Amino acid sequence: MEAEVDKLELMFQKADSDLDYLQYRLEYEVKINHPHSAGEKNAVAILKELSAIKSRYQALCARFKTVSVEQKETKSCICAILNKTMTMLQELQKQTNLELTLLTEEEKAVTERLKSHVPDVENGILQRNFDGEKISSKEIQRGV
């Protein structure tokens, strides 16, 4: 997901650069080709609209960056909560001497999708818990 965010940021930067170039080129063309023509007011109005569009675009970029940062923070928080929950589950299993049953195919598929979407989650915790293997107290203390 971060690669997609970086790609979008690069696209926004390129679009910003393209807008700057277009504005410069239009101003140059108006000065050179139409110094006293009747169409000059229209060209100026277009340039003002281009500036307004650029301002709105920059505001959108700023909001996009804010959303991106918040999204990363939320993802980190979810991963931390999930890791803590899995550790608590392991401790509860240890205290009650219970083991998880093996997962169904559907549950395994969901687990794999979760791992692929949230790589920050400690795979050791998820793998061992979801596979139903018993975890020793030493592993729990190490946070595995």
From Swiss-Prot:
Using the UniProt record, give the first listed, main subcellular location.
cytoplasm
GO CC entries: centrosome; cytoplasm; kinetochore; meiotic spindle; outer kinetochore; SKA complex; spindle microtubule
Localization in the cell: Cytoplasm, Cytoskeleton, Spindle; Chromosome, Centromere, Kinetochore; Cytoplasm, Cytoskeleton, Microtubule organizing center, Centrosome
Q: Which UniProt keywords apply?
A: Cell cycle, Cell division, Centromere, Chromosome, Cytoplasm, Cytoskeleton, Kinetochore, Microtubule, Mitosis
Listed under GO biological process in this entry are: attachment of mitotic spindle microtubules to kinetochore; cell division; chromosome segregation; establishment of meiotic spindle orientation; mitotic cell cycle; mitotic metaphase chromosome alignment; mitotic sister chromatid segregation; regulation of microtubule polymerization or depolymerization
The record's InterPro entries line, in alphabetical order, gives: Ska2, Ska2_N
Q: List the disulfide bonds.
A: none
Under the heading Pfam families, the entry gives: SKA2
- MF (Gene Ontology): microtubule binding
Presence of keyword Cell cycle: yes
- Function according to Swiss-Prot or TrEMBL: Component of the SKA complex, a microtubule plus end-binding complex of the outer kinetochore that stabilizes spindle microtubule-kinetochore attachments, promotes alignment of chromosomes at the mitotic spindle equator (chromosome congression) and assists suppression of the spindle assembly checkpoint. Kinetochores, consisting of a centromere-associated inner segment and a microtubule-contacting outer segment, play a crucial role in chromosome segregation by mediating the physical connection between centromeric DNA and spindle microtubules.
Q: Fill in the subunit field for this protein.
A: Component of the SKA complex, composed of SKA1, SKA2 and SKA3. The SKA complex is a homodimer organized around a central W-shaped coiled-coil structure, formed by the interacting domains of SKA1, SKA2, and SKA3, each end of the 'W' is extended further by the C-terminal microtubule-binding domains of SKA1 and SKA3; the complex forms extended structures on microtubules. May interact with NR3C1; the relevance of such interaction remains unclear in vivo. Interacts with the MIS12 complex subunit DSN1.
What PANTHER family does the record point to? SPINDLE AND KINETOCHORE-ASSOCIATED PROTEIN 2
Would you identify the family this protein belongs to, as annotated? Belongs to the SKA2 family.
Task: Please identify the protein, giving its name as recorded.
Answer: SKA complex subunit 2
Organism ancestry: Eukaryota, Metazoa, Chordata, Craniata, Vertebrata
